[in-house]
Amino acid sequence: EQIADLAAYHSLFYSQSKVGHKPATGASYGLSDQDIPLRPLVKVHPVTQRPALFIGRHAYGIPGLSEAESEALLERLTAFACQPPRVFAHTWQPGDVVMWDNRCVLHRARPYDYAKPRVMRHVRVAGDPITEAGIIA
C-alpha cells in the first residue's frame, strides 16, 4: 500500500547507460521519437487481479522523490523481488523452451558463454497493447 500510488519513468537508454553503453546514431531501438513513459510501480494483473511490481532496470525517477530516494526505493523493491521463493533460474539444455507471463514477472538475462549461440523469440499472445504498456496519461 505504501507504493500503490507511486510511478517511475522507464527508459532503455537509462538502463543501458548504467552499464556503460552510449547511444549511437541510429541505435535508438525505435524509442527516440517517443516520450519516456511514466508507469506505476504496482500494476494489477488483468486476469488474476493480483498486484505485481512493475519495475526493473529500466525504471528510474519516481516523481515526488529525490534522485537518491528514488534509486534507493527501486533498489529495495528489486532486492525484495529477487529473493527466494520469488526466483526461478533455469538451467538451459538444448531444445528448451521457457515461457512466462510478462505482466507479472521481472526477468533478466544471466551471464552466459558468448561463444555459444542463443536463439530467442518474443511473442505477444494476449493482452491489450495500451493497458499492457501501463503508461500513465
Describe each PLM feature range.
Residues 1-97, 102-137:
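Non-heme Fe(II) oxygenase catalytic core, chiefly the N-lobe of the double-stranded beta-helix
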